[in-house]
């Protein structure tokens, strides 16, 4: 590989660890690797990702363009040995053609950028939220009484047809659009490709960067960082045909943010449905065959809107836009940004999108999104494995099954005379299958069984006549017949007709049931079924236990895959599970230090309390009242040594409640004092409750106000709760972080027993040696997987503090198990380095003295 850039076009003077990060990233992209990057929050990770990847991309494009021009000149020289001047002329002409296309595009985009700036100022006091009026009627469900019953009748269905190749297969999973709409989208795709090819010179296989994060909020922050960056042109200097006054080096970053219909829909009546599934289905309903033109969505691009879609494309590329900007642009232009954004995709360099749109095959197909030979970067990837499993898991309750059964039975009875052979047969099969599942759940409620447990799928399908069902054919019928859409549409129509509608949109229950039936009839070796009893209902869940195969198709398609996060440790899960099939030479892991100087962090374990109790928060010992009281006195002492804000993380809400109950009790011989009152002498106490939801923000504001008032505050939080992820406790909000115990998942739960059993079995099957050795290796793999789940949660809590170069904090891990080498080995590198400097075990009083010395003389801010 050639030499790398010096500073990777970083907008500031990069720190040494940022340079290390960008160099490693550049190399991984160039060599087509899969890599895991850990860089603590506050180290400028986002800019490092942007600058490292975009610098590589522009250099890659420059080389590709040079090769294209060279090949063109070689082709010209193939005819009877053309003279040198002719070859040079061909080379210049090829370069000129590309240069002119790029220059024309940049000029158009610059003009749009200036226009948008003017519009922003002009419309500051206007009505920017209003959609531009289209020359079509606004969509509406109309007067329900005028709806024709025909729209709810299923099309004839032939499950034995050999070929069912439709436009929806070509365009992805967007079944339900009318044939004309599908043809239109296909035609647009071809026309946009052709016209844009002429305008920009982009090729279909131009490498792109797909940047993925968990939420649109995180993606918006990334977009803000992207606006800071200016990249050199991908045009080789020797190919430039411009004069001295023309700056060919000006080439803006071409960015597109993708979102779901729920994020991008601009149709008020569809948006008002609120529920994502309902929005998706109503959108498709408005495009179905037979829907009158005036009833269709007026914002869906039509053939006459081709020019407008191209304008939308250019407006999108002119400036960096987040998801809100895309919605506003669609409203201003009166065109659906969800569909119009497809015209932008091909011409983008960097595409941002949330987890579900990348990680779900059906979502990628719906967007016509190919990642073949492109770069995939997944940020905030510490929970990637869980996210993949959750996306491909489905939960349903007995009450929802009963509702779906009632709706389906009513629909079948109402349209009995008009349902022909195959439709009638399959609907009867679905009713039998749902009844079988519901019967099993009802019997589970009645039996003296644990609150949760595993379910054998054969038990769910043991009902009368279910054994005669062909799972493959019924699965295909559910996916292709649009039954759920027809039934849910009929239910809504009936409610409106009978004036039973309310303002609250209903969730399409049959779609949920359908999504559950598909894995039930096509069981995966990586999935399991579980039940959970609660209140007067029972929940049934299909859970994906292993994300490997679902992510594998992304890894095998992409040129390179990068996982990045502030706390990616422990790393072994990626090597042993998610990427177990990858050759070691293709997989790299990197863990970088912090930008703070070493003296700004003190990290320590604490084994004994001020009264001498050994802190052992294992399941068998954690309820010791003596230990919990000693913990309270120790926390009080630590709060005296640590200024401003301290955040303490407990293993669970239940255990925090147990501790608070003991801390509220009057202490013997201390005149009514409690542990809480002892702590409150030092700091005000606030705590995170279960299911706080929107109240979390109020809690944080109160915590901040208390600290700003000079009182100091202790915030009692829970690992895995709202405050343990995504919340920044920078500066005086997080001068101290206390981790009480280790938050191991409940090993007795059916889910975790299944997970560990799966890991052990998979490891056993892939290992070699004697039976004893294979069993030992399998047990060790299960133990490691279980510990990693715990330590990943711990590391997330630790990462809440130290958010920038000048920040400083103390981190205290309270439990004897934190002394173990295998546990410390799973901590982030920057924490381990701090602990090595203070490797001697310290009693609580000595640690408090160390903390006092650490904070003395430091100015709070």
From Swiss-Prot:
GO terms for molecular function: ATP binding; ATP hydrolysis activity; DNA binding; DNA helicase activity; iron-sulfur cluster binding; metal ion binding. InterPro entries: ATP-dep_Helicase_C, DinG/Rad3-like, DNA/RNA_helicase_DEAH_CS, Helic_SF1/SF2_ATP-bd_DinG/Rad3, Helicase-like_DEXD_c2, P-loop_NTPase, RAD3-like_helicase_DEAD, Rad3/Chl1-like. Belongs to the DEAD box helicase family. DEAH subfamily. DDX11/CHL1 sub-subfamily. Its EC number is 5.6.2.3. This is ATP-dependent DNA helicase chl1. Residues 114-153 are annotated as: Disordered. Binds 1 [4Fe-4S] cluster. One of its GO terms (cellular component) is chromatin. It holds the Pfam family DEAD_2. [4Fe-4S] cluster binds at residues 265, 283, 297, 336. Keywords: ATP-binding, Cell cycle, DNA-binding, Helicase, Hydrolase, Iron, Iron-sulfur, Isomerase, Metal-binding, Nucleotide-binding, Nucleus. It is found in: Nucleus. Residues 4-431 form the Helicase ATP-binding domain. It comes from Neosartorya fischeri (strain ATCC 1020 / DSM 3700 / CBS 544.65 / FGSC A1164 / JCM 1740 / NRRL 181 / WB 181). The gene is chl1. ATP binds at residues 39-46. GO terms for biological process: establishment of sister chromatid cohesion; interstrand cross-link repair; mitotic G1 DNA damage checkpoint signaling; mitotic sister chromatid cohesion. Its cofactor is [4Fe-4S] cluster. Residues 114-132 have a biased composition (Basic and acidic residues). Disulfide bonds: none annotated. It catalyses: Couples ATP hydrolysis with the unwinding of duplex DNA at the replication fork by translocating in the 5'-3' direction. This creates two antiparallel DNA single strands (ssDNA). The leading ssDNA polymer is the template for DNA polymerase III holoenzyme which synthesizes a continuous strand; ATP + H2O = ADP + phosphate + H(+). Its main location: nucleus.
